[in-house]
UniProtKB/Swiss-Prot annotation:
Matching InterPro entries: Arginosuc_syn_C, Arginosuc_syn_N, Arginosuc_synth, Arginosuc_synth_CS, Arginosuc_synth_type_1_subfam, AS_cat/multimer_dom_body, Rossmann-like_a/b/a_fold
Chief localisation class: cytoplasm
Coiled coil: none
EC number: 6.3.4.5
Biological process, per Gene Ontology: argininosuccinate metabolic process; L-arginine biosynthetic process; urea cycle
Superkingdom of origin organism: Bacteria
Protein name: Argininosuccinate synthase
NCBIfam families found in the cross-reference section: argG, PRK00509.1
Annotated S-S bridges: none
Catalytic activity: L-citrulline + L-aspartate + ATP = 2-(N(omega)-L-arginino)succinate + AMP + diphosphate + H(+)
Cited Pfam families: Arginosuc_syn_C, Arginosuc_synth
GO molecular function: argininosuccinate synthase activity; ATP binding
Organism the protein comes from: Ruthia magnifica subsp. Calyptogena magnifica
């Protein structure tokens, strides 16, 4: 990349140690103006502090945007309509946040007539891939600066030394006492990596978990919750209509209080290595269970089974950074077509780390009590018909058995 041609850069900025250093590094290395962008997607931090820190670093244009509703409505909910889960365990909390941030980075770059965008993802992880693939899908000519792939800073200590040397304001005592884990949070989840988690045999300390109580210490009384779906999306909890972001906030609080949503995973990163992460996804755990329950009542068998076959590929696309790719959009269109009839109410029980479906109802239900009953069905189903069905399906098996 020709540094001479870089006059203005839009940086995805959190206000933390890494991105605070990146501001100064970009200014010194590229001799460019830096515009910062901070997305509020429910990370639970005081995002306005990012404005103060950016201004102190000499940033003139600071973008701080509340994207909570857009994040859930246009990214989280569509993903959950697919029942997406990566490698059978991961609910994609970090993965699904990256497309929206990339989208706004590109849009702000266009608005500011910037020459490049930049992010603080390391050269070892998935996020660098996600940020950049999503950005290139929206602007083929966008230039991306990834400082972690260029500079020689390789540890927290080296970052702190750089900050001290260049007069970057950070709370050194806070940094030294900082959690040993690398954390990332939004309305869908909070993740933990690093520290003792780098040993896959080591159990995380109880005080690591921030959103959920230990199931052992959860209430001894179960809580019943009714979730209302319309076209595959949650629109109400216990009869109270809520916005998408409010749904997430409510379920995170309710489910977290019962110890629901903890997960400890070793996953295969897109870049090739295995990585261990711990996740708290209270609302997502509930949503997946409830949505599958609603689909079990309303979706045709073959459509439901085909959807399940497509889901791992969909989840892989999200995980790897292909949200804006044509194949993900194609699958989304097919999935959303199935959701027109996913309407109704699911009743759940929360108790000591478990979420159990205890009831479901829908005006679009395909369940026929008259046909399914073990009692007299008054001729609704002729059991004699099953003989021919079995005989035809057994044909290839019988032919094989004759050999």
């Amino acid at each position: 990349m020709n540094k001479i041609n870089i006059k203005k850069v839009v940086l995805a900025y959190s206000g933390g140690l890494d991105t605070s250093i990146i501001v100064k590094w970009l200014q010194d290395t590229y001799r460019c103006e830096v515009v910062t962008f901070t997305a509020d997607i429910g990370q639970g931090e005081e995002v306005e502090l990012a404005r103060t820190k950016a201004k102190a670093a000499g940033v003139k244009e600071v973008y701080i945007e509340n994207l909570r509703e857009e994040f859930v409505r246009d990214f989280v909910f569509p993903m959950f309509r697919a029942n997406a889960i990566y490698e059978g365990e991961y609910l994609l909390g970090t993965s699904i946040a990256r497309p929206l941030i990339s989208k706004r980075l590109v849009e702000i770059a266009h608005q500011e007539d910037a020459d490049a965008i930049s992010h603080g993802a390391t050269g070892k992880g998935n996020d660098q891939v996600r940020f950049e693939l999503n950005a290139y899908a929206l602007d083929a000519d966008i230039q991306v600066i990834a400082p972690w792939r260029e500079w020689d800073l390789s540890s927290r200590e080296s970052l702190m030394d750089y900050a001290q040397k260049h007069g970057i304001e950070i709370d050194y005592k806070k940094q030294l006492k900082k959690s040993p884990y690398s954390m990332d949070a939004n309305l869908l989840h909070i993740s933990y990596e690093g520290g003792i988690l780098e040993d896959p045999w080591a159990e995380p300390e109880e005080d690591m978990w921030r959103w959920t109580v230990s199931p052992e210490n959860a209430p001894n009384k179960a809580e019943y919750v009714e979730i209302t779906f319309k076209k595959g999306g949650i629109i109400a909890i216990n009869g109270k209509t809520m916005s998408p972001a409010s749904v997430m906030e409510d379920l995170n609080k309710r489910a977290g209080a019962h110890g629901i949503g903890r997960n400890d995973i070793v996953e295969n990163r897109f870049v090739g290595m295995k990585s261990r992460g711990c996740y708290e996804t209270p609302a997502g755990t509930v949503m997946l269970k409830a949505h599958r329950a609603m689909e079990s009542l309303t979706l045709d068998q073959a459509a439901a089974h085909l959807k399940d076959e497509l889901m791992p590929k969909y989840a892989e696309m999200v995980y790897n950074g292909f949200w804006f790719a044509p194949e993900r959009k194609m699958l989304q269109a097919a999935i959303d077509n199935t959701q027109e009839i996913v309407n109704g109410i699911v009743r759940l029980k929360f108790y000591k780390g478990n979420v159990t479906v205890v009831g479901r109802q829908s005006k679009d239900s395909l369940f026929s009590e008259k046909i399914a009953t073990f009692e007299d069905d008054e001729g609704a189903y002729n059991q004699k018909d099953a003989a021919g069905f079995i005989k035809l399906n057994a044909l290839r098996l019988r032919l094989k058995a004759l050999k």
